[in-house]
Regions:
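Helix-loop-strand module that forms the ligand-binding subsite of alpha/beta enzymes
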Residues: 5-86
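Charged, glycine/proline-rich intrinsically disordered loops and linkers
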Residues: 1-3
Length: 127
């Protein structure tokens, strides 16, 4: 009803997301994915007419200002499912017409012996 009447007042998160210059998200790897609250956030920002829309030919129309989304993930063990995590986030970028998607991860942080600081610094140098 709100969208049908062009009333987007209930979609503040989506409006904010659509208007930022660059997006950086850092989250732990939990249960083969990201935290559930981050999933809820993604669901709240996927709003037709704010963060994406289709033209009369079914082609996506760019609505999000950002040109880059960077996702940083850490994990205590191996990231055995990183391909599906990457794929989901890449598809969000495609939906939002964000042309550049950077995906950085550091895994095995709970495996000893392990110099966590050195591994994090090495990953940060890739930015």
């Amino acid at each position: 009803m709100y969208i049908k009447n062009n009333n987007f007042s209930k979609y503040e998160q989506a409006i904010d997301f659509a208007n930022v210059d660059e997006i950086v998200i850092a989250a732990p790897y939990w249960d083969m994915s990201f935290p559930s609250l981050l999933k809820v956030y993604f669901e709240n920002i996927c709003v037709n007419g704010i963060t994406f829309e289709y033209d009369e030919n079914g082609k996506l129309v760019k609505k999000v200002k950002a040109k880059t989304l960077t996702y940083i993930v850490t994990s205590g063990g191996p990231l055995s499912n990183k391909s599906s995590l990457y794929s989901y986030l890449k598809e969000l970028c495609d939906l939002f017409s964000i042309p550049t998607f950077n995906f950085y991860y550091v895994d095995m942080l709970d495996v000893y012996p392990n110099d966590v600081c050195d591994r994090l610094i090495e990953t940060a140098k890739k930015f």
